[in-house]
From Swiss-Prot:
InterPro entries: Ribosomal_uS15 (IPR000589), Ribosomal_uS15_arc_euk (IPR023029), Ribosomal_uS15_N (IPR012606), uS15_NS1_RNA-bd_sf (IPR009068). NCBIfam families: PRK08561.1. It comes from the Archaea. Belongs to the universal ribosomal protein uS15 family. This is Small ribosomal subunit protein uS15. GO terms for cellular component: cytosolic small ribosomal subunit. Residues 1-24 are annotated as: Disordered. One of its GO terms (biological process) is translation.
Amino acid sequence: MPHRSRHKKGRSSSVRPPHPTVPTWIQYTPEEVEQLAVELARRGFPPSQIGIILRDQYGIPLVKPITGKKLTKILEEHGIKQELPEDLLNLIRRALRIRKHLEEHPKDMASRRGLQLVESKIHRLIKYYKRVGKIPQDFVYNPEALSHLAT
């Protein structure tokens, strides 16, 4: 499937199984997987990084088939909740980086166009997250107010 706002086609990648089952070679119990995830989150890793660490260092391919819950749900149950979803937060950080670049290089039209594309993705995601209830209905994307997220 082609990418939105790009002239290139999408890239092929490995396909995840349609009905993932718990592999027989996994030696961790669901409680141990939850504890590992919570420990990594307390050390400051976002959910995507936690999944990669569990896959690469602990040999846990997917959390949901083992525990029956998604990783973000596990973290919420243990009191670790993000104020914004991770994908939206990453897009906001990217937009803030581009804005900072444009302050120093105001005639960089390619970056200005990139900022438009990133901010349109942000607005689409905000509409979706408001609809499903992941962010409050009165949330407004304001780059100046969200500048504390740039770190």
